[in-house]
């Protein structure tokens, strides 16, 4: 069976396909992981990770008729979150969010999106004692018009004082997982503990029962 991995983020595609290949090998399943024939624009307007993952997977399934896997994931910082988890579903574009926008200066916008997001989190936490945070990932697989399966993963930790490490992407350089004294971006085998792996393992467990 072909399974389409729906993301335009090259690093995310590599991480997801690598995890899935290792799971497939362990179970000796007949699965082929493919990129979509072309990228399509999907408006992720929902306010939960689950809904956004489903929206993307369903849109790609409808476009190409191939079983589709999509992930929506993000960082949740306890000190920023009251009734709304932040950055949460807005993690990829947190630097644009009006929440805390005063901490970014005009000259900062020469940085990459990932660097801007990390910088904003660090500046907002400069005088904050509570640095607890967690990564959340929800994976959706749409197998037909009427059937989908879901898996969720969570990795708890806290925010570092400064970025460190060259592995990973996104908020990995500023996130220290529980039980570690370095950032996720400095852990070479981070895929073995990541929130995304947990979500993929959960959904893979359900998928293998159907094959």
UniProtKB/Swiss-Prot annotation:
EC number: 3.6.1.66
Catalytic activity reported: XTP + H2O = XMP + diphosphate + H(+); dITP + H2O = dIMP + diphosphate + H(+); ITP + H2O = IMP + diphosphate + H(+)
Cofactor note (record): Binds 1 Mg(2+) ion per subunit.
Top-level EC class as recorded in UniProt: hydrolase
Metal-binding recorded as keyword: yes
Residues noted as binding substrate in the record, renumbered to the chain: 7-12, 73, 169-172, 190, 195-196
The protein's assembly and partners: Homodimer.
Function text: Pyrophosphatase that catalyzes the hydrolysis of nucleoside triphosphates to their monophosphate derivatives, with a high preference for the non-canonical purine nucleotides XTP (xanthosine triphosphate), dITP (deoxyinosine triphosphate) and ITP. Seems to function as a house-cleaning enzyme that removes non-canonical purine nucleotides from the nucleotide pool, thus preventing their incorporation into DNA/RNA and avoiding chromosomal lesions.
Matching PANTHER family: INOSINE TRIPHOSPHATE PYROPHOSPHATASE (PTHR11067:SF9), INOSINE TRIPHOSPHATE PYROPHOSPHATASE/HAM1 PROTEIN (PTHR11067)
Protein name: dITP/XTP pyrophosphatase
């Amino acid at each position: 069976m072909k399974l389409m991995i729906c993301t335009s983020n090259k690093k995310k595609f590599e991480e997801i396909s690598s995890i899935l290949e290792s799971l497939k090998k362990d179970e000796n399943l007949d699965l082929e992981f493919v990129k979509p024939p072309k990228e399509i624009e999907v408006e992720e307007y929902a306010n939960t990770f689950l809904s956004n993952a489903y929206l993307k997977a369903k849109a790609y399934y409808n476009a190409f008729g191939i079983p589709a896997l999509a992930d929506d994931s993000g960082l949740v910082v306890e000190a920023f979150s009251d009734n709304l988890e932040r950055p949460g579903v807005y993690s990829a574009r947190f630097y644009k969010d009006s929440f805390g926008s005063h901490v970014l200066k005009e000259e900062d916008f020469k940085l990459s999106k990932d660097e801007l997001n990390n910088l904003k989190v660090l500046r907002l936490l400069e005088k904050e004692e509570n640095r607890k945070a967690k990564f959340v990932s929800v994976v959706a697989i749409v197998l037909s018009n009427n059937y989908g399966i879901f898996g969720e993963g969570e990795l708890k930790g806290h925010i570092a004082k400064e970025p460190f490490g060259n592995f990973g992407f996104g908020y990995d350089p500023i996130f220290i997982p529980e039980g570690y004294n370095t950032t996720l971006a400095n852990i070479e085998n981070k895929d073995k503990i990541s929130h995304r792996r947990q979500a993929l393992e959960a959904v893979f467990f359900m998928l293998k029962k159907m094959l």
